[in-house]
Amino acid sequence: MRYFLWFSLLFSLLNSTTQIPKDPISPNIIFILADDLGWSSLSEQMDPAMPGSKSDYHLTPNIDRLLKSGMRFTQGYAPASICSPTRRSILFGHTPMRQDDESFGSRYEPGKNSFLTIPQVLKKINPEYVTAHFGKWDLRIGIPPASFGYDFSDGDNGNGQGNTINTKDEKWTTFFTEDNPKQIDTLTNRTKRFISDQVNQNNPFFLQLSHYATHANITARAETIARFEKIPKGDKHHHAAWAAMLADLDASIGELISHLDQLGIRKNTYLFFMSDNGGVEFIAPVKNRLDHPDSFPSPMCNAPLRGGKWTLFEGGIRVPFFVSGPDIPANTSSNRYVTGYDLLATFAEIAGSKQPNSFSLDGNSFKASLSNPKTTSDSRNLYFHRFNNGYPHSAVRSG
C-alpha cells in the first residue's frame, strides 16, 4: 500500500513537470479607417489643450468612449490628403512619394517585388494570424485584397460599393436616406461574424475595417437626420445630414465595441482608429481642387486647422488618430507625431517582432509610446506631396 502511494505521488510529479503550458495567444489587432473625417469633427477634443479641437455640433459618444479608453495622438497624420495614396501607404508602410501615383500599379503588383503588406508581415511573425479587410479598398489598380495576402475580404471595393452616387451635381447639394447608409450595418455584421469565428477557433486575428462613411454622397438614416435638424447648429459644423451620417457611423462603432466586450477579448485586443485624410473645408466645397491651396476663405469645417481634403495644410492631413488596448493608459494623450505608414511597423511589434522596422519600411513603430505618452517624436521629417489631380504643392512636418 505504501509502495502504491509513493508511485502515485511520483507519477503525479512527473506528469506535472512534463506538461508544457501554451504560450499566450498573440494579440488581436483591429484597425478602423474612417473616410474624410476631419481632425475636429468628433464631439471629444483631439487635443486636450485646444478646446476648439472638437465639433460644436456633431455627436459621437461611442467613438469618444473608445478614444478615452486609450491614447489619442494629437499630431496624427494621414500619409496623403486624398484616399487612395493613403490606403496604399498604410498597406505597405511606405510613403506615397516612394510609391508614386502613376506607376504604383505596375511597381507594386504582387510577385514583381519583395514588398510586404500588413497581412504578409503578420503571418511571417505568427502564421496563425487570420487576416481580413472589409469595406473600402480603393487602391484603384484592379487588384483585390486577397492578392495582397488577406484571408477574407469583400473584394476590390471603391466608393461605389458604399452607395456613393457619382453624380457631381448632386454629390454635395443633396443628401440621401437609407436604412443601411454607407453599408454601415453590412460591414458591422460581417465584422462581428469574422471576429466571433476567430474567437471560437482560438485564432489571433488582424482586421481592417475601412468604412465608406463619411465620404460623399451624404447618406444617413432619415430618423438620424431628423434628430440633428432639431439640434442647434454650430458655427463650425451645421450640416444636419452630414452630422447624421457621422452619427450612424458612430452607432456602428458602439455596436462593435459591445460585441468585443461580450466576447471578453478587449484585454487582448488593440483597436486603432484614424481617417484617410482630413475633412473637406466646406460642405459643399467652394473651390476647385485644381485651384491654388490659398484660394479658399475662412472659417472652415476643420478649424482651428487650416485647409482640408485635397490640400497639404494641416486640415488636409492631420486627422483623428488614437489607440486603445492592453497596457495603454486610459484617457491619455501623446504629442509625438505619427502617420499612417507607421502602422505596419507598430502592428509588427505588437505581434511579437523584435525588429519591426526590418521589413523595408518607411515608417517607425510607435508601440513604446502606447505605454508611455511622454515618449517624444523621433528626429525624422514627414514629407507630403500632392502630385496628381490637384494643384502641385508639398509640405514638411519637422520637429
Predicted regions and their residues:
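Positively charged n-region of N-terminal signal peptides that target proteins for export
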Residues: 1-3
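Formylglycine-dependent sulfatase
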Residues: 19-398
